[in-house]
Structure formats: C-alpha cells, structure tokens
Amino acid sequence: MKEKEKIIVAMSGGVDSAVAAGLLMEAGYDVIGVNLRTWEYEAPACDTTKKSCCSPEDIRDARDVGLSLNIPFYVIKMEKVFGERVIDRFISDYKDGRTPNPCVECNTFVKFGALFEQAKKLGIDKIATGHYARVIEVDGRYAIRNAVDMKKNQTYYLYGLSQDNIKNTVFPLGEMDKSEVREIAKRMGLPVAEKPESQEICFIPENDYRSFLKKKGMEFTPGFFKLASGQIIGKHQGKEGFTIGQRKGLGIAWKNPLYVLSIEDDGTVVLGEEEETVSESFVLEEITYQALAPLALGQSMEMKVQIRYRSAPVHCKVTSLGETWKVNFLEDVKSVTPGQSATFYPTNGDYLFAGGIIQKGSITRKIKSNVEVQRESVPI
C-alpha cells in the first residue's frame, strides 16, 4: 500500500484553516495540524468576545478541530521570530513615520518562512493554509494567483513568499467562495463552522495601536500641523499617532476636510485637501519577484499595481533602478502610504509579478498646495 504524502496544515483556530485540513484529509493526505504561538497574551487581549486571531481561545479551537478530524495536532512556539520580524518592525516603522503592514511580515517570515523550516526538520516538504489564493507556474517561475472569491482574495499579503515556498504550498480554498467553505465545515461537523472571522491585528487589542506603542515604551514626538505651502495651522501630541490619508481625529477646524499628506522626521504633519492626496509616483524597495524575473537596470514595463488591501489595482509604469523600482501611476491614486506594501500584476493577468514596500520620502504628489490659509482657525 502506497504511503500517504505528509502535509502540515497551519491551523489558526478559524473555519478556513479547519476546512483546508479536512479537504486535504479527504484528498488522501496524511495531515498534521499545527498552531503557531506568536504572542504572549495579556488578559484583556484574551477576551473571547473579540474577533482577533492567534489567541489562547484560537489555540483551543484549533486543538478541538484536530480532535474532530482525528489528526495529530501540535503548538509550535514562534514568539521569538514573530517578535523580531513582526513586532520590532511594527514599532520601528511607526517611530520612523511609516505605516507598517504586519500581516505581510508575518506571512513571509513566520507562517511560511519559519513554518517551512520546521517542516523540513521533520522531513515534510509541503504545507497548506486556509488563505484564499492559488498557485500558478508561469514560464518556469511560481506565483500566487488570485482566488476565485475576490471578496476574500489574499494575494496582496502573500507577495513575500519565495519560489520554493510557493512551489510547496497548497491552498485548498483557492477555488471556493466563503459560503461554500461554511457549508463544508457544517458537513464535516467542525466545531468552528459558525465562528466569526478575525478582524484585528492579533497583537493589538481593540485595534488601538497607539496604546500598544506606548506600552512598548515609545515616546511620541509632538509637533506642528502645517499645510503643503508651509503655513503652520496647529499642534499635535505625537506624529506616531497619524498615518498618510488619515482624515478623522485630526482636531483641526477647516472649511473643507483635511487629510494627512506626509509625516516629517521633526514631528511635522503636513495636511491638505482631498485633491492634494493624489500621487504621481513612488519608489518601491525590498522587492520580491514572483512570476516576473528580475528587471535589468533601466528596464521599464507597464503593469498593474495595488497599494492597499481593499483597493483595486491600477495601471502604472515601472522602471528598474537596480534594487528598487520607480513606479509612475497612469491613473489617479490617492494617499500612497510609505511603509505599506505594493503588489504588481500583469496588465491582463490575475497573478503576482512582484511586490515590495513603498519607500519613505519617495512619493510625489500632483498638487503641491491647494489650501487657502484661514488664520482665524489656527488653534496654536
């Protein structure tokens, strides 16, 4: 009798990874379930009424799924790599005026990078997750392809995977929509069939990142609000509490809504009206290539770019500067944010060419200043 192929399934305690494990069992794999313990949780973060992920409650749910499926289940301690790769960068990015994307870092270095290292120690080549994505091979290179359910599509968070990791990853849910996954969970009798989806950053209770940063000892840098023209219009208590494109919570009275245009090292937060948020270009750094082979210095190419998870890709032209790209938009795009990820796709394709980080200080805007100063409204 042929021995079943072993596969490790990363089980978060949610319905998606539970169904992924069940489907692989039905497909004939020898499934081993693992949960990655990434964070030492304080009591408030363990409130089971909150829709977070990776909490002690989620570990219990993942273990219950393992019992229900009758598969081996293990908890792997990942606090060290998670702290170094995800939390440390999260803190340093905010301190430096960038807006981080911890889920990208976690996928790249923990859920796939570190987990593959553990799998290889056990002599296991393949892992699977409950991500909504697919794998495609293009001209001898591997890439993440959009899921069928575009409302759940997660390719944006997976651009950092290496060629070897993509090749050896299975995404059982890539061809399904969420409602179908729920029905399969009910058919399988899984205890998490009706569990709500996670909606928070796992280590940020209540999504209050400012309180988290303060607990980590970060000192906020107070400074001035000013317009792109240079006119000072107010004060704030810390640049670390703002992000590019932010409109709410500024505390500035103005005839039209103001948005954060940039955050300067000296603590200055530059504001402008909505039309001033439109960007012309930016520089991409920390590039990971997937279907696209590395571009030669000076080589240009038109493609599509996505600058945030919920936004639609837009047309752009990229030019290789060596280790970075110059990205010029061919359509209007608002509030390009340094520190966030940008993913790239063929103009007529549904798979990843490449991805990287939007470089701080590299963003050019179409309109430099369009706000008339209202001296009577300046709360200094």
From Swiss-Prot:
Where, subcellularly, is it found? Cytoplasm
For the region Interaction with tRNA, give the residue spans.
152-154, 308-309
Entry annotation: catalytic residues: 106 (nucleophile), 202 (cysteine persulfide intermediate)
**Documented EC number(s):** 2.8.1.13
Give the reaction(s) catalysed.
Answer: S-sulfanyl-L-cysteinyl-[protein] + uridine(34) in tRNA + AH2 + ATP = 2-thiouridine(34) in tRNA + L-cysteinyl-[protein] + A + AMP + diphosphate + H(+)
> Hey, where's the site called Interaction with tRNA on this chain?
131, 340
Q: Name one Pfam family in it.
A: tRNA_Me_trans
Task: Report the main location listed first in the record.
Answer: cytoplasm
Highest taxon in the source lineage: Bacteria
Keyword match RNA-binding: yes
Alphabetized NCBIfam families for the sequence: PRK00143.1, trmU
Family, similarity comment:
Belongs to the MnmA/TRMU family.
* Protein name, entry field: tRNA-specific 2-thiouridylase MnmA
Q: Which organism is it from?
A: Leptospira biflexa serovar Patoc (strain Patoc 1 / ATCC 23582 / Paris)
Q: What is the lineage of its organism?
A: Bacteria, Pseudomonadati, Spirochaetota, Spirochaetia, Leptospirales
